[in-house]
């Protein structure tokens, strides 16, 4: 099974501390962040179609190699979208894929770090248990980088007039 589901903690009768629940929640959020990144991205390429690219560690290494090929001036670079046959991509398409992958990963790593700081600030088991990956993080726990990345995605969602 690729993805592991997480069940809410059920009291086994043992003493449950805030620290125990906090550490469990941080581990759960870390796993979801990792799964989200590995799940990958949809990227629209120069042919006008969208393709899905997984971002497992191996995929990330492959994309780094492809980026180097593009920088070295290789005009047609072989690669494949998920479930697709290998084909040649232009330098522009490879750069589009790599930049989208970097942005996606940067956002999720930055988001998780802010979420972790927020979780560490919580003092009740109920508040910690209520934390969900993807929730809005209070501004006091958002880094400058996270605020910047959020503003970029908000600006991208606004159609130009």
Label every PLM stretch briefly:
Residues 3-161:
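A preference for well-ordered globular domain cores
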